Amino acid sequence: MSGGVDSSVAAMLLKEQGYDVIGVTMQIWQDEEEAVKEANGGCCGLSAVDDARRVAERLEIPYYVMNFKKEFKCHVMDYFVDEYLRGHTPNPCIACNRYVKWESLLQRSLEIGADYIATGHYARIDRLPNGRFAIRNSVTAAKDQTYALYNLTQDQLSHTLMPVGEYTKDEIRALAEEAGLPVAHKPDSQEICFVPDNDYASFIDREAGEKVPGPGNFVTEDGRILGHHKGITHYTLGQRRGLELPMGERVFVTAIRPETNEVVIGSNQELFTDKVLCENVNYMAVENITEPVRVLAKIRYNHKGEYGTLTRQQDGRVLCTFDVPVRAATPGQAMVFYQGEHVLGGGTIVL
């Protein structure tokens, strides 16, 4: 229970369906100062604990706060920093889902006798004719969260319930209001929970210290120096704002080269490609692919997706050849493949 309306209604729905429900909030803040900073925001700060506890009291279910500080620091915060130092743009929510919310929380839940964990994600889970579990799109495309769940394993899915996926956001709020839940109109959290001010570069500076590369050069693809940048952790592929380059035309970040501490600048057209390669592939609806497969692929969370052909490479990586070029496929982000409403799988973009 994050203290938000979605997980609160998920708990309520499951209780109504006859489940024995126990509310749990994950403690992930690293120290009291950080917890105070997050007191008015974030999904697992002090205010979230207060809200979740009030909901649990209203629903008359047991409620606990479980400490996952170590797991969160290792699998999410350190990963986030390391990826930026490599010139990548990570998605920490995907790492948190796989390694903290599911791997760690599920293991601890099973150890104390639970059969499932349940969340307030806008997604559904199906058992397919081939016997495998797969995430299915929620009924509301605007809130669909299947992209961030592609990395879950078969065992994790077999012990997971997602009751909110059958409803729209307005319906969830209406159910919460009807039940008198105190979080019925609580705003959705928009930022990364451990960077509540959205200042990624300052967070990385604090966490990585001397490992953070300093200022370097803006360059063209062929190496011509255009100016000086503040440090590669300030930039991501496709970025236009904040470059402060007097070019006389709109220019964008087209690549980041951590090995030379350079940020490559180019035109918007240079950001488009019809081929995207990914690694660390997790298959969900199928065990593997051996032949080319037609899919709808999304290259970022809010991407509507484009159709393409998926081909498995000899080294296990997967190449998607898109029918229409996609813009700013960013190393470190996930590419998630869909067949119909189901997640076929996904991986981390490398090229």
Describe the predicted segments one by one:
Residues 1-150, 161, 170-171:
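ATP-dependent adenylation/nucleotidyltransferase module used to activate substrates
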